[in-house]
Design a protein with these regions (language model features):
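Extended ligand-binding regions for polar small-molecule ligands
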Residues: 44-45, 78-91, 149, 157-174, ...
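Alpha-to-beta junction loops
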Residues: 93-95, 113-122, 165, 210-220, ...
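Bilobed "Venus flytrap"/periplasmic-binding protein-like clamshell domains
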Residues: 66-70, 74-90, 143-202, 223-224, ...
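Ligand-binding clefts/hinges and TM-proximal coupling segments of bilobed small-molecule sensing domains
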Residues: 44-52, 174-195, 270-326
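Extracytoplasmic small-molecule ligand-binding "clamshell" domains
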Residues: 45-123, 127-128, 197-199, 287
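Acidic, polar ligand-binding/catalytic clefts
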Residues: 85, 97-161, 172, 242-249, ...
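Periplasmic-binding protein-like
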Residues: 65-66, 138-150, 230-273, 290-316
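Immediate post-signal peptide segment of exported/extracytoplasmic ligand-binding proteins
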Residues: 44-75, 158-166, 309-326
């Protein structure tokens, strides 16, 4: 979903159900609809759902964005790249290779669907464009603001302290619904959702504006909020927005995406996720990702959940049933 093309962030999981699917489709890899996934690269003259598994048995072939931190970049940085390296070691793969393409419309078709790679490292659970593994992390949109200021203690977008403040928001993402309900849109600053990540970065631009004082707070997809706040030092609070009610979900499970035919590959990855969850968590946390358990409690290093926090019934009602380690 990024603040870039897909933001790696969900852009709407609302009720009724048809809205939920539209939202997930928009999220996944630009979260824009990709109507058809041709299977010309598959072994049979079929579409994306060919029954033949084409996974490379020796090399972990990863589909990635060339400039989309904290997820990945062409320099080999990002938590997706580190998780991929971990999986390669655990699965006995001799190497990790990458097929880079901006995560905008056509990403799945041009990478996984063309058999250039065998795994998309981050994909929202429930989207139809790929087959999902079990989730390997769960996070939420987050509010970022300077520590020690008048916004200290804010955990809801409807908090009166935000009235009249200039809040940055990526256009078309779920927090916008709550901001509109709270009357914050009149003074909000919108940043584009669909962009070419090689040229611009909405999350980075938003955090730069926050540091300059051009906006008072920022609302971003959790991994981006945590990463850019961490890069800025200890000056910003990152608050997962898990207490919003009566609107689209704000917390989502993130999986790995594989081809629909790759059933054994999916099972292999599910085992690897379950066996290495603590190490995966530590990688994500090192990038500032605000990890949440199923009750919206923050997850600490080595997978230990903190004692505080609370669940969001709307999120659990809208989210698919499969948990992080099913």
């Amino acid at each position: 979903m990024t603040a870039n093309a897909r933001s790696r962030a969900p852009v709407g999981l609302d009720v009724p159900r048809n809205r939920a699917w539209r939202g997930l489709r928009r999220l996944a890899l630009a979260l824009l609809a990709v109507a058809a996934l041709p299977g010309a690269a598959l072994a049979q003259d079929r579409e994306f759902g060919s029954e033949v598994e084409l996974v490379d048995p020796d090399v972990l072939r990863v589909c990635a964005d060339p400039n989309n931190m904290p997820f990945s970049n062409q320099a080999g940085e990002g938590f997706e790249q580190e998780v991929a390296q971990l999986l390669a070691r655990k699965l006995g793969r001799s190497d990790v290779t990458y097929s880079y393409f901006p995560q905008a419309t056509g990403f799945v078709r041009m990478t996984l669907g063309s058999n250039l790679c065998d795994i998309i490292m981050s994909y929202p659970q429930g989207d139809e464009l790929v087959q999902n593994t079990n989730a390997y992390y769960r996070t939420a949109y987050a509010l970022v603001y300077p520590k020690g200021g008048e916004l200290d203690g804010v955990t809801l977008l409807e908090d009166p302290k935000l009235k009249g403040k200039r809040v940055g928001i990526v256009a078309g993402t779920p927090p916008g619904t709550y901001m509109a309900k709270a009357g914050l849109m009149a003074t909000a600053k919108a940043y584009p959702l669909v962009i070419d990540t090689r040229i611009e970065n909405s999350a980075q631009s938003m955090m730069t504006d926050l540091a300059k004082g051009e906006i008072d707070a920022a609302v971003l997809w959790g991994p981006m909020a945590g990463y850019y706040a961490k890069k800025a030092g200890e000056d910003f609070a990152v608050v997962p927005l898990t207490h919003e009610e009566k609107g689209p979900a704000m917390a989502y499970r993130i999986t790995m995406g594989v081809r629909p035919a790759d059933q054994e590959w999916k099972r292999t990855l599910n085992r690897a996720i379950a066996e290495n969850q603590s190490e995966i968590n530590d990688i994500l946390l090192s990038y500032g990702v605000p990890l949440l358990d199923e009750e919206n409690r923050p997850i600490a290093p080595s997978g230990k959940a903190a004692a505080s926090g609370g669940g969001n019934d709307a999120d659990r009602a809208n989210a698919p049933a499969v948990g992080p380690k099913g």
